[in-house]
Amino acid sequence: RSKQIIASMTIGKDVSKLFPDVVKVIRTKNIELKKLVYLYLINYAKIKPDLIFLAVAAFHSDAKEGATPLIRGLAIRTMGCIQVPEVVSYLGETLTYCFKDKDPYVRKIAALCVPKLYLTSPQLVREKDFLNTLHDCLKDENPVVVANSMQALNEISVLSGANQLKLKSKYLRHIVKYHRKTKQ
């Protein structure tokens, strides 16, 4: 039934009235079904902002305690795509511990969510000190996390009109080291 709902949504049919029913499926362990539910929620969150709070706890739980890095990353990516105040406030809190996740996949997704958060709430990005967190990620052991952090800082620079990508020599040495490795 969920696949039918998503198929209807993708061809332009209004299935927003099913929002409460779809939210009930969010706790599924089936990753494919979870992806479909998250896609639906991204699509209809602005239409049903009063109901998105039903999903916020599940996003938060999946991002923090998801069984796999894929689920944790999917949860924060979805939260980043939903520009509704109820989700934005939780995203700030959620990103704080996602940047500390042991898996680089989760950290790279966290980095990419900061510009989305900045678009909606620059004040929250400053309060949570995410610009410094992104700069700290420039020293990450994973080159994809480093690249995504640079991309995020660049996007925020464009959005803010001020250069946020202030590379210190310690960051540059680290970045050059990874650049050499990836060229080989």
Question: For the regions a protein language model found, what residue spans apply to each?
Answer:
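Internal, well-ordered domain-core segments that constitute the primary functional module
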Residues: K102, V114-N148
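Short inter-helical turns and helix N-cap capping residues of alpha-solenoid HEAT/ARM repeat scaffolds
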Residues: K29-N30, G66-T68, K102-P104, E141-N142, ...
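Alpha-helical solenoid scaffolds in large eukaryotic transport, assembly, and signaling factors
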Residues: R1-A58, M79-Q83
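Hydrophobic residues within the alpha-helices of tandem HEAT/HEAT-like
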Residues: I5-M9, Y40-K46, R77-V84, L112-T120, ...
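HEAT/HEAT-like alpha-solenoid repeats
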Residues: V15-I26, D50-A63, V87-F99, L124-L138, ...
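Beta-propeller blade termini and top-face loops
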Residues: P69-I71, G80, P104-Y105, A111-P122, ...
